[in-house]
Amino acid sequence: MSRLAVLALISLFVLPVRQGMADDFRVIPNAAMREEYNDNIFFSDDAEQDDFITTASAGLEVRERTELLKAALITRLDGLAYADNSELNAIEEYYKGSVGYQLNPFLNLSADAGYSVDSRSDRDLDVTGYVLSTDVRRRQDYSFSADYRASEKTSLFSSYSYLDDQFETSEVDEFTGQNVLVGLTRSLDFTKPTAARLYGRYSHYDFYSSKVDNYSVTAGFSRQFSEKLSYVFDIGPRYTEGSEKRTSETSYDNGLGGQLTLTYNEELTTAEMNIFHEVTGSSGRDGATERTGLVLSLKHRIGERSSVRLGIDSYQNKATRDEAFATDLNELTTSLAPSLRYEFNPEIFCEATYRYTVITDQEADHEKHRNLMFFKLTYQYPVVE
């Protein structure tokens, strides 16, 4: 049913536009082979187990673009084969669709839908800092947004998103999240392009044994220092209410949240740093957490066909049971990942990556380490362009 919902959404905007002779329509099939060595596939702190993993991927990308509409459908199947732990072999599925439509010169509407089936224990590591079990997860997510230009200087924004994670055997890890966001930006008359920002957000998280409601308001600025350097800064209060399903006991907490994003772009080098603090929920933990994150990405082109990249991710997930959170948690996850990419031609490219990860449980005072290395070869060829 979830797969059909995603594909039905895509057909609603792709097929009618094709009949109307779109300005730009592309169909791009792709295939990839990834060979990986992982020295701690279960992220164990006392019984590390290594393995070689082969991942064969096949996918299809369909893109549609006209003066008023942008649409995309991306599908991919990954076949995972473990050299020693064959019981972990799996087929992972990914489906993603998006559509954006310019209703008039002032109003733009967009929608996204996604469905995936995955099982790797590190599937969320780069996003949340969490390590999961190898239980099969079925995820569906949907979002809708509207941008309205109220005047030459003022814009309004609103969005709604829904995420549902269901696991094949473990109910404890299941999670449903909903987010509502409204915002306003206004350009200011400064010498450099600057905009004031005001956002309000409501989030509802439904876990196995608890529910959490979080309310936040942030105010800040975005500013373009130069053609190469820009920043975004937001900060504001939040109020959190958590309740246990079994006892209906409710607790409350409050604090600050926000973000700082710096972006640098030039011809050969791009860099971005994002620092944020928020209350959020995700699958793999029975309760919300206060998450503080640092994400740094640096990319440099060293030749016409080659580039290097350095990624650093660090997430601290904290929760105190007496403060609107269901469990005690104090965990720091840090990863370092240098990589090299080479393009043989526009259709074929390869990537070599090393990734080191350390997870520190600051409650129990112990660490888990993992080294991962992989080489990936990708082929993509537009059959309709």
Feature map (PLM): residue ranges:
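Cleavable N-terminal export/targeting peptides
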Residues: 1-26, 382-385
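Gram-negative and organellar
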Residues: 21-385
